[in-house]
């Protein structure tokens, strides 16, 4: 497992990661991102502070954030087309179970339920009008105020189950050797998704653990869809990150803040006109994503990757390339 930090000169996927120390040897770093940084391993305390920084942001800005996050993402259309094409829905004796890790304000659930019912000739803008929704939703998020927001998406979505859980806090409490089979209060899903969250997960170790938790929550034959934010390829977002990080050097966002602790791809982004609001975000490249998927195998005794990649594509934003989607099938 190399976590995206191994040398491009090597084609050996078994080379060790200098950050995680998995499978051995040190290699020359190659950071494809245009803003390269010297590699530094993120320590546990610093990672915890970054997580708390984001938790504080969403608690304090849940309303304004949700107001700007109402429209569905174009990438969701293709995601659901692929997922439903792969699943033999006719053989599923229960509503299709959809698990959403970091569900936010439930707009994906609103999109999925509304689109499915619209296809049946029912008003997609009011999905609760039909009790025969073909989906059963299980959403998990650390911020209930965001999930159950004032616009009432959650109240309009049929067959919705919500669990308030800070998955990163739960994973950080585990011994590194532990791999819990049960982390969520939900049955195994036919479709598991994680949109707009991976960029908030600090360090290679915890990104692999989050993906592993998503894989374990999916039944064999089920579909897993994840989005990875490539925000530093967008000039406007890159400028926002530069400004926020310069501000953080003058007014640190938390005690012990040290930008030298960042990994390549780690950034801070501000929010609207609040000079004290920060979000920790990680910019991904394709090699990191590939290594992340491969990294899940370290949790399985056979050493085999428990998923097969079906498709990878760009979507969203003005450029149509703001997010990188990866669609996996659970083996």
Each model region followed by its residue ranges:
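Cys/His-coordinated zinc-binding microdomains
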Residues: 4, 21
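A conserved beta-strand element that flanks and buttresses the S-adenosyl-L-methionine
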Residues: 193
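A short, conserved alpha-helix within the catalytic core of class I
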Residues: 201-213
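Conserved helix-to-beta-strand junction in the class I
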Residues: 213-220
């Amino acid at each position: 497992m190399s976590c995206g930090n191994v040398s491009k000169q090597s084609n050996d996927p078994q080379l060790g990661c200098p950050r995680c120390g998995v499978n051995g040897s040190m290699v020359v770093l190659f950071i494809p991102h245009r803003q390269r940084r010297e590699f530094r391993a993120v320590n546990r305390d610093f990672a915890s502070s970054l997580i708390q920084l984001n938790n504080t942001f969403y608690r304090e800005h849940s309303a304004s954030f949700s107001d700007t996050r109402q429209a569905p993402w174009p990438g969701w259309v293709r995601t659901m087309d692929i997922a439903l094409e792969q699943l033999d829905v006719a053989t599923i004796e229960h509503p299709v179970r959809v698990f959403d890790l970091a569900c936010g304000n439930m707009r994906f659930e609103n999109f999925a339920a509304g689109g499915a019912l619209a296809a049946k000739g029912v008003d997609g803008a009011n999905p609760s009008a039909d009790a025969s929704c073909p989906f059963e939703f299980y959403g998990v998020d650390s911020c209930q105020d965001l999930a159950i927001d004032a616009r009432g998406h959650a109240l309009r979505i049929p067959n919705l189950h919500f669990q308030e859980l800070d998955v990163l806090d739960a994973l950080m409490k585990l011994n590194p050797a532990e791999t819990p089979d049960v982390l969520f209060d939900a049955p195994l899903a036919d479709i598991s998704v994680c949109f707009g969250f991976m960029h908030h997960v600090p360090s290679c170790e915890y990104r692999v653990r989050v993906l592993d938790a998503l894989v374990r929550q999916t039944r064999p034959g089920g579909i897993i869809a994840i989005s990875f934010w490539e925000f530093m390829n967008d000039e406007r977002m890159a400028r926002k990150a530069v400004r926020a990080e310069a501000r953080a050097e003058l007014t640190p966002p938390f005690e012990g803040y040290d930008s030298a602790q960042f990994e390549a791809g780690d950034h801070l982004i501000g929010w609207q006109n609040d000079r004290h609001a920060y979000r920790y975000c990680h910019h991904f490249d394709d090699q990191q994503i590939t290594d992340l998927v491969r990294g899940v195998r370290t949790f399985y005794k056979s050493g085999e990757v428990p998923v097969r990649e079906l498709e990878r594509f760009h979507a969203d934003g003005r450029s149509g390339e703001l997010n990188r989607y990866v669609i996996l099938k659970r083996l």
